């Protein structure tokens, strides 16, 4: 009886350590993202993509209107430092 309890306890501990490792790894990979305006006058897709990748190599670009119905601005989403 003690051996089965000891085995169950060992399996529970190993399982807990594995779960905590997976959760910690997922939390480590999630980063905070920051936004910066690369070009506030206009947003042409190729130009915006180029400017964003030059300024932030891991950045993703997006054209967002400055005001409803207004001109689009080039925004770059990148990992915060």
UniProtKB/Swiss-Prot annotation:
One annotated Gene Ontology cellular component of this protein: extracellular region
Pfam families, per database record: SLR1-BP (PF07333)
GO biological process, one term: defense response to fungus
Keywords: Antimicrobial, Disulfide bond, Fungicide, Plant defense, Secreted, Signal
Keyword Cytoplasm belongs to the record: no
First and last residue of the signal peptide: 1-24
Compartments, record wording: Secreted
Keyword Secreted annotated: yes
Disulfide pattern: 34-80, 43-63, 48-74, 52-76
Family as reported in the entry's similarity comment: Belongs to the DEFL family.
Protein name: Putative defensin-like protein 148
Organism: Arabidopsis thaliana (Mouse-ear cress)
Gene: LCR4
């Amino acid at each position: 009886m003690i051996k089965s309890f000891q085995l169950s306890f060992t399996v529970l501990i190993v399982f807990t350590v594995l779960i905590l490792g997976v959760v910690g790894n997922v939390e480590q990979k999630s980063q905070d993202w920051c936004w910066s305006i690369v070009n506030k006058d206009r947003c042409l897709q190729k130009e915006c993509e180029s400017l964003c990748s030059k300024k932030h190599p891991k950045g993703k670009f997006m054209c967002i209107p400055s005001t409803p119905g207004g001109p689009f601005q080039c925004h770059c989403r990148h990992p915060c430092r």
